[in-house]
Amino acid sequence: MKLLLTLLVNCLLLLYTHYDYIVMGDGELKEFIYILCNLFTIGFDASIVTLIVYTVKNKHAKMAISGVFWLWCMVNVVYLRHFNTYVDVTMIGEVRNFDMLGESIWALIRLRDFVVSAAYLGAFYWVIYRLTDKKEWIKWYWMFVPIVLSFLGIYYANSRIQSSSFFKTFSWWGGDFTSNTYVTAYRYGFFHFIYSNLYTLNMHRDKTDADAQAMQSLEKQRKSEAVKYAADAPLPDNVIFVLMESIMSEAVTAVCDGDSVMPNLARLANEAQYSNLNMASEVGIGWSSDGQLIYMTGILQHSIKLTVNAFTYNSFRGMGSVCKELGYATAMVIPTGKHVWHQNDMCQAYGIDSLYNTVKHGQDYDEALIDSTIHVLNSYKNKRSFITTITISTHTPYSHHFSKRLRDYQDKHFVEQQLLYFERANYFDFHLGRLIDALHKNGQWDNSLIILASDHHDGDWTDREHARIPLIITGGFKLPVQKHDKTQIYQTDVYLTLLGLLHVDQSWRGVGKDLFNPKSHRLSPKEKQRISDIVLETDWFKK
């Protein structure tokens, strides 16, 4: 009786943990027809927790384990409401990164959280301390073990029973508990996930003849498209890459309450030598980390695994490495801890030598980030530099007012989430204007190549297929062609375009298209992914 009650309570807590994931609208309705097999999976995961609790004999230890399980679930509930994802394993130890939750913590907590927490902990206390018939629970325990083992056999033997997931990300116990909503390993439950990870934790493999043929074919194609650069072709003094969090093209052009939401970015788009508000997002399950990977390396993220976790120590022909070979100092400024999403390790992989973060400033968001970026730019004023800065204030959620907002938007032409998103976009735009003013004031605008690009789309009022993100290339460095481009482009085009602007002649040129080279052609989506997986799985550039 005790064990079955414990199992039931754990199941209910898991169901509650994933409740917000469903109501966010991230689940696909067609998957709900699999409710029975997915409830089976929830029960199976809860069974694991129950077995752990009842393998321990000490009552206080049982209660402690239950408390840890409750705490982890509630942390994920609150974190999910803010970031639309569960807590990633890389967040552990990066407590300061949770400062971003500070301003909205009370807006994120619901009354039902307290009710569920009290019910769960109260039920566990009653089961552990009040039901004292040891012979009874021992008997149930040993009956329960073969049942769980039978579940395992049935579940693994017939994995098709789990053709999709009711909660998509229900088994986050074993490692990459992130927004891996399309990874099939998460669709088969806890033990299947652990079993598969024993064999796929290391995704690296040896190069094959087929790999070599694919890469040689790509290199041959790139050679046929190549432009010959003069040995004395001019280079910009600075390359400044502003990687904008969740900035959508609609925000750049939006007028709300009679005013431009992002006047500085809109002006840059209008005055830029090159601008395109029709860039398609190509990120996968890693979202922001994938966007950074695409821009820095010219490849897509891995087709299955979370790239920054599975391929952290790969070698790449990163933009940092390319710029260093041209004599540039390299640095990145970020708003999170250095180890979040393995940022420190990924910077090394991209060839970026110095990493600065503003996490000590807590909730100053992009104000502190831009201050730090200006300081870093000043410190590199007398040398060529490649500086990347990654913004944060426009991150989800768009469910409550932004404490640092400069405007309270009321325009009834937009849904509430858009208005809340505009608050954040307007705040970021103000501080972007400060950065642009500082570049002009310090004389660093005149011969700089400045790239502003969004990491991915966002917003529940739109979808990936129709959402577009901006690419703006500006600064005083003269581009070969000046135009406001309306054709559809892709994130993978940026890497090869930058190689062309920096007159880099190398065999690896990414999977995209050079936007300034009419002879250049991008690969098909299928071929892009194939080449990207080869580069990642074989660690193609490892020496």
Regions found by a protein language model. Name each.
Residues 316, 338-341, 478-543:
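Membrane-interface soluble catalytic domains
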Residues 427-466, 495-502:
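Metal-dependent active-site segment of extracytoplasmic phospho-/sulfohydrolases and closely related
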Residues 263, 321, 371, 375, ...:
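Feature representing long, continuous alpha-helical segments
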Residues 1-191, 195:
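Transmembrane and membrane-interface helices of multi-pass
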Residues 415-431:
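Active-site-proximal segments of metal-dependent phosphoesterases and phosphodiesterases across multiple
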Residues 233-235, 464-468:
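Short, flexible loop/turn motifs enriched in small residues
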Residues 146-241, 246-415, 423, 511-515:
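Active-site-proximal alpha/beta segments of enzymes that process anionic O-linked groups
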